[in-house]
From Swiss-Prot:
Task of the protein: Serine/threonine protein kinase involved in the cytoplasm to vacuole transport (Cvt) and found to be essential in autophagy, where it is required for the formation of autophagosomes. Involved in the clearance of protein aggregates which cannot be efficiently cleared by the proteasome. Required for selective autophagic degradation of the nucleus (nucleophagy) as well as for mitophagy which contributes to regulate mitochondrial quantity and quality by eliminating the mitochondria to a basal level to fulfill cellular energy requirements and preventing excess ROS production.
Domain Protein kinase: from-to ranges: 27-346
Protein name: Serine/threonine-protein kinase ATG1
Biased composition regions of type Low complexity, renumbered to the chain: 418-431
């Protein structure tokens, strides 16, 4: 609670009792108007002028280095661009818990609400011109008139064309800066009533101004460059993104086509519950886009018909919604299509309405001051010459960009004149310097980033694809001005070996002091596995290149040894593994007698290792098949293993382990083992029969995604899968229960599965450590009295009450917080890489099963899989799906430096063998056996050359691992003799 002195000072300053507004700099914070996963948006106003603004409050506690990179991307983009159809960034602030973006306030909501409300948004009313047919429109209860839209279907054609033209202007401007938005959707297209100046300059009267917002996913992407991350909203995603393929700026054109379809029809072109189903529907359409009026015409229905979509808009939508990017309309053709010609400026001709209007409701017009001003402005604009201005791509704000703006040269190519560049909005007068900086030390003054020399630019480690040679953008553009940051002199870490560093927007943190005593496994981490900086020290994705153009720099691009983009989990692998497991399940015969041993160092069958998830009863009618599709990018929801109830339904579907819960949580599954014990919880973690495995029955739709997990994988199994699943299962009994080829296969696959399993367990431990550190950071950074539903703004009273203690411990507490964040990121990095290595072993094993199955089905018609082979396939499928989801979630918490923690696996093997020895001394022989086995599996995984980036293990490491395995094997053999003797005595 605020103390009396603070309360009294606030009352004195405010001038009235119990009246206080939260403030951020020179801005007063008002009511909440929006909320997302990582940010809350509030409406506010300038304290002196009372001009409305929007304040986007982003919680620093939720920001991993990846999310911070997205935020810095948005900040740096908005700071250097100035366009009437792009939401403006006014100012930036930060405190210990939040980063605040003060942005232009758009009072007309967004396009999705506009479509849903048919334009009836309170702030978008207008007064028709004198003598216009719109003056005959009916008014609402408050005497307001809104733009007339059809009662169903899409928007009025004139509004659709105007909105499309405004969106095209924004996209053309972004193209001039080599920017792609990557998340164009109706929710990110904000609306604002046209100002007097905009109406005077020719903006269509009564039609709102459209502004593109939310650049959190935007990135620099030259014309020929390709991206490969999953960003954006599924319903408006291009199919190449849904297929996890590389994509270029043409992905934005698909999104534009989807938005245009929704404006014209009233709904998205494709709808589905998840992106796998969405991709299936897009592929099924085969580029055949059918509009509602065409369906009604073909069916010759006598019911009420839909509003027809103009033919030129239909043609444009079909040209944009092409599945293959090469077949999709290009930017030049899009800008020259002419669909919005005549609808970007006010027409002097009389409007013609296609709707029936009443003639008795013109009263109540012009009641508000704003409406009267609009009428006056319209009358004055009749005799006013519409000014023309050179386009200004960059803000002329001296505080944000001290250098003079350089206008973009006009494009002189044929046909480009159709898309007129709108005049820049008036530059606001800034009376204060920018407040944004992410570093923890307040700088004395802002400094400009100096463009790096060519020699300082990071060199990619891999040669570029010849087919993807970067070309100069055909659109002429000015050199952007330097981005201003308060800590621009700081250096960014490099993820590769050596001491090379990149420029950063943040300052280096002070020396770090651990917040608590005691050894930590991450403190002894070699330098090659640690990011030399806080997660808050991620460099902004936009920097200045040697030629003055905007560039995107990433630690991964300069890495020589990190995992980086070589490991991209793809949906196609998930589909193939699930499909093959389903086929094996369908083609299995009655259970066989399992061979007792394959001569391996391990006695436990691999089938006993079930997924670490609660068992789900197969006969439970309230549970349904849960998709194992990877979670959408930037999702903070971890892959929980929880039962998801549903209504009972028919069919032959069997439940799978759930993947994503209905409730959101920022932490990964609670089923992760909290300790590496092998005693009492062994029975709970390790199943005892194949029946405990979850079997799936829904084969996934096969996509055309390029496989990037461990290189290219054979796709020849697809034909065999389709052929085998189409046959009836014949009643064939195998002559012999022993198949030498299958026995060799299972021996090899089991060894791979064991390696995958132990790496998965170790990854779970690291992910658990990450969540515990996250909880520690959340607890330590939440001040008393500021929890619960308190808005995330700095409260003067609480700050005054705690000022003394803060001044004494601010340095140590900040260092502790940064230390926790670094350890949290390091744990997530380890988890991601270990999950990926585990997935690599699983995929390798499944490929062997796939090749074996194809050979058998090609030679023997109606070949029946053994129960053992089916059991192995189900285990691999279940483990792949669980590992896949956890890797996707851990990736959102990880940083840029992703190196294989071989030292961690080695230390884990040694510790586990020690624990096993202690258990043996205490007489717990079963637990000791499991510990020795696990230790050997870990060392065998280290001896597998496939886990290393260069494909070979260092000789000295191989010798060390072999030397360590000898005594463990000796102990295991002796222990098994004891177990055999004890079992023999028990039998007697």
């Amino acid at each position: 609670m605020p103390d009396s002195n603070a309360q009294g000072s606030r009352e004195k300053e405010s001038g009235h009792h119990r009246s206080h507004k939260e403030r951020i700099g020179n801005y007063v914070v008002g009511a909440e108007i929006g909320r997302g996963s990582f940010a809350t948006v509030y409406k506010g106003y300038r304290s002196k002028t009372r001009v409305p603004i929007a304040i986007k409050a982003v919680s620093r506690q939720k920001l991993t280095s990846k999310l911070l990179e997205n935020l810095e991307s948005e900040i740096n983009i908005l700071k250097v661009i100035n366009h009437r159809n792009i939401v403006a960034l006014t100012d930036c602030f930060k405190n210990d818990t939040h980063i605040y973006l003060v942005m232009e306030y758009c009072s007309g909501s967004d396009l999705s609400v506009y479509i849903k409300q048919r334009g009836n948004i309170p702030t978008l009313d207008f007064v028709p011109k004198a003598g216009s047919s719109m003056a005959l429109l009916p008014t609402d209860d408050e005497g307001k008139i809104y733009w007339p839209h059809p009662p169903t279907g899409g928007l009025d054609e004139r509004v659709t064309r105007s909105f499309l033209g405004q969106l095209a202007q924004a996209i053309k401007f972004l193209r001039a800066q080599d920017l792609m938005h990557r998340d164009i959707k109706p929710q990110n297209l904000l609306l604002q009533p046209a100002t007097e100046t905009e109406v005077a300059e020719g903006h269509p009267y009564g039609i709102p101004v459209l502004k593109v917002a939310d650049f959190g996913f935007a990135r620099i992407l030259p014309a020929a460059a390709m991206a490969e991350t999953l960003c954006g909203s599924p319903l408006y995603m291009a199919p190449e993104i849904l297929r996890y393929e590389k994509y270029d700026a043409k992905a934005d054109l698909w999104s534009v086509g989807a938005v245009l379809f929704e404006m014209s029809v009233g709904r998205p072109p494709f709808r589905a519950n998840n992106h796998v189903e969405l991709l299936r529907r897009i592929e099924k359409s085969n580029d055949n886009i059918v509009f509602p009026d065409e369906k009604e015409r073909d069916s010759k229905s006598s019911d009420e018909t839909s509003i027809p979509v103009p033919s030129d808009i239909k043609a444009l939508i079909r040209a944009l919604l092409k599945r293959k990017p090469n077949d999709r309309m290009g930017f030049d053709d899009f800008f020259n299509c002419g669909v919005w010609d005549g609808h970007m400026a006010e027409s002097t001709e009389e409007e013609s309405l296609s709707l029936d209007v009443s003639t008795d409701s013109s009263a109540g017009l012009g009641e508000s001051d704003r409406i009267r001003q609009m009428v006056a402005s319209t009358e004055q604009s009749k005799d006013r010459l519409i000014p023309t201005r050179a386009p200004q791509p960059l803000a002329a704000d001296a505080a944000l960009n001290p250098q003079p703006a350089v206008p973009i040269s006009r494009d002189t190519s044929e046909g480009r004149s159709r898309l007129s560049t709108p005049p820049s909005r008036p530059t606001p007068t800034r009376r204060s310097t920018p407040k944004y900086y992410v570093g923890d030390a307040t700088p004395s003054e802002p400094t400009a980033i100096i463009p790096p020399s060519p020699s300082s630019a990071p060199t990619p480690t891999s040669a570029p694809d010849p087919g993807l040679t970067t070309q100069q953008s055909p659109t002429s553009r000015a050199n952007p001005r330097p981005i201003i940051t308060a800590a621009s002199s700081a250096q960014r870490r490099m993820s590769g070996k050596g001491d090379g560093r990149e420029a950063s927007s943040v300052e280096e943190a002070a020396p770090i002091t651990p917040p608590f005593a005691g050894p930590s496994p991450t403190m002894a981490r070699p330098s090659r596995g640690i990011n030399e900086g806080s997660p808050l020290a991620a460099a902004p994705p936009i920097t200045m290149g040697p030629d003055g153009r905007l560039e995107r720099s990433s630690a991964l691009e300069g890495s020589t040894s990190g995992v980086g983009t070589d490991y991209v989990v793809v949906e196609k692998q998930t589909v193939e593994i699930n499909a093959l497991a389903d086929e094996l399940d369908q083609a299995s015969k009655r259970p066989m007698i399992r061979r007792s041993s394959r001569g391996s160092v391990v006695s436990r069958p691999v089938s006993s290792f079930k997924p670490i998830s609660p068992n789900i009863a197969k006969n439970d009618p309230t549970l349904g098949p849960i998709s194992y599709s990877p979670p959408f990018a930037l999702s903070s929801t971890p892959p929980f293993a929880m039962q998801v109830p549903r209504h009972a339904s028919g069919g032959n579907s069997f439940p799978r382990n759930p993947s994503i819960p209905s409730s959101l949580n920022a932490f990964p599954p609670t089923t992760i083992s909290a300790s590496p014990s092998y005693g009492q919880d062994a029975a709970a973690r390790f199943g005892v029969s194949p029946g405990s495995l979850q079997t799936g029955a829904l084969a996934r739709a096969l996509t055309n995604t390029a496989i990037r997990l461990i290189g290219t994988s054979a796709n020849t199994a697809a034909t065999a899968i389709a052929r085998a699943t189409a046959k009836r299962r014949p009643n064939i009994v195998r002559v012999s229960d022993m198949d030498a080829a299958e026995d060799d296969l299972l021996c090899t696959v089991e060894d791979l599965a064991r390696k995958a399993f132990v790496l998965f367990e170790l990854a779970d431990e690291r992910l658990l450590a990450q969540t515990q550190l996250a909880q520690t950071a959340r607890t330590s950074s939440t001040p008393t009295g500021l929890t619960g539903t308190t808005p995330p703004f700095s409260m003067q009273a609480a700050a005054a009450a705690q000022a003394g203690s803060r001044r004494k411990s601010s340095s140590s507490s900040m260092n502790s917080e940064v230390w926790i964040l670094r350890q949290q990121e390091a744990a997530a990095n380890d988890a991601v890489v270990l999950y990926m290595k585990s997935l690599a072993f699983i995929v390798k094993a499944m490929d062997k099963v796939k090749r074996y199955w194809k050979n058998r089905t090609d030679v023997y018609d109606g070949y029946v899989a053994s129960q053992e082979l089916n059991e192995m396939g189900q285990w691999l499928r279940a483990r792949f799906n669980e590992t896949f989801e956890k890797a996707e979630w851990a990736k959102t918490q990880a940083g840029d430096t992703l190196l294989f923690p071989d030292w961690l696996v080695h230390d884990k093997a040694r510790d586990t063998s020690r624990q096993a020895a202690v258990a043996e001394l205490q007489g717990d022989l079963t637990t000791a056996e499991q510990g020795y086995e696990t230790s050997l599996w870990l060392l065998q995984a280290l001896l597998d050359e496939s886990v290393y980036e260069n494909g070979s293990i260092p000789d000295e490491d191989k010798v060390a691992y072999d030397r360590l395995m000898v005594p463990i094997k000796t102990r295991l053999d002796a222990l098994r003799k004891k177990l055999a003797e004890s079992s023999g005595m028990t039998a007697r």
